[in-house]
Amino acid sequence: SEMCIRDRFEIGPRKAMEVFRAFGPGAMQAISANPYLLCGEPLQLDFRHADSIAQYYHMEGDCAQRLEAALLRTLRHNAGNGHTCLPRAQLLETASNFIHQPPEKLARALDKCIETEELCVKMFDGVPYIYLPDLLAAEQDIAHRLAILARRGKNTARDLDRNLQVLELTQGFAYAPLQREAIRKAMTENCLVLTGGPGT
């Protein structure tokens, strides 16, 4: 029950409910076998909390569950900073510094994660990059859609200047030159990234 989960693993009532929803009646058993499930999706509890539960169960600091969880956590943390992947060597070094375990042990855990498709690897210029599967799928989907847009013929913005003048007159203000350029590109380019700035 949620009460047992709360008491055993020292987590708040809301998280206990989420644990029970995620793992069902076998939650206690699943977390006892692998406390690091708590810091993965969808719960994302603090890694150190999972560490303390693992210590309660006398799990070693270099156990497979901890090594694999450290790799996943490192990738998720970097995804939060805008990185969809990391070079293999950088991932191993970062995870090694995080849990104070040698990169060689993490390399074996990484190979297992790739084998079980928990993580994905792609080569770019001879360098292996490691991805979380959902981020690789998203990146490939975006690349595919951009390729489709790039193949389309460009639009011609007929009478754009005249239409802009009419718009300015009816709305009672004039667009700045950069704003006019942004509108022109939005009307003629197949794909446009408009970054923030004054007037956007």
Where are each of the predicted segments found?
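Conserved ATP-binding/catalytic motifs of P-loop helicase motor domains
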Residues: 1-200
